[in-house]
Amino acid sequence: MSGETPMCSIDLSEVKAKETRMAGRFRVSWYEQYIQPCVVELLGSALFIFIGCLSVIENSPDTGLLQPALAHGLALGLIIATLGNISGGHFNPAVSLAVTVIGGLKTMLLIPYWISQIFGGLIGAALAKVVSPEERFWNASGAAFAIVQEQEQVTEALGVEIILTILLVLAVCMGAVNEKTMGPLAPFSIGFSVIVDILAGGGISGACMNPARAFGPAVVAGYWDFHWIYWLGPLLAGLFVGLLIRLFIGDEKTRLILKSR
């Protein structure tokens, strides 16, 4: 496995981009280093959030959380398997933060990735509104996270968002970035973690785990109640996982302390 490129990391020093000969030297295409990954993050985020929003808007009350859980998890796994080798397949600001902390993404690309993911979320949520019957759209609050209605629910919802996002980000970083544990089933395990998270915590916080997934529908539906939970929780979780891997559970290359040499 050590010879494989980590799917959810992007090391610019190892990018196998198109090389063009100029003045006797080879240079790596700047487009494939900087622009193409951001385009893919925008595209993947738009597709993922479109499917996720539509699964909530069209969800039958009889199915409970099953339809959104399967749609979100399967869509994310499929999109990562399809596009992950170009951008790393993050499609989530919390994931990008963690991958940056553990050295899988250049710091200079973190903000462009976030911008791409957020705009992708806006596009996906807007497309979901366009294709959805108006009554169903508004009945579902446009797939915005409206489950937290009272101040008393905030602590539980924030705690659940942090814990659920930790599981998701661990699946990404350990399955697709950390060389010692990465493997070909990473897209499956990442998608499966989303399914499990939504089934477990959807009734408490909505199981967002992704600020871009929260922001797009909030803008389109104009629903901002307790919106900050879905930024603070996932980003704290991403930072925590990044530090956990950097300090304790990462491989020799990633870990900053307790090295053998």
Curated annotation (Swiss-Prot):
The keyword Cell wall biogenesis/degradation does not apply. SUPFAM superfamilies: Aquaporin-like. Residues 58-84, 129-156, 205-228 are extracellular. Reversibly gated by a two-step sulfenylation-persulfidation process in cells undergoing diverse stresses. It catalyses: H2O(in) = H2O(out); H2O2(out) = H2O2(in); formamide(out) = formamide(in); methylamine(out) = methylamine(in). Its main location: membrane. GO terms for molecular function: ammonium channel activity; methylammonium channel activity; urea channel activity; water channel activity. One of its GO terms (biological process) is B cell differentiation. Keywords: Cell membrane, Endoplasmic reticulum, Glycoprotein, Membrane, Mitochondrion, Mitochondrion inner membrane, Oxidation, Repeat, Transmembrane, Transmembrane helix, Transport. Channel that allows the facilitated permeation of water and uncharged molecules, such as hydrogen peroxide and the neutral form of ammonia (NH3), through cellular membranes such as plasma membrane, inner mitochondrial membrane and endoplasmic reticulum membrane of several tissues. The transport of ammonia neutral form induces a parallel transport of proton, at alkaline pH when the concentration of ammonia is high. However, it is unclear whether the transport of proton takes place via the aquaporin or via an endogenous pathway. Aquaporins contain two tandem repeats each containing three membrane-spanning domains and a pore-forming loop with the signature motif Asn-Pro-Ala (NPA). This is Aquaporin-8. It comes from Notomys alexis.
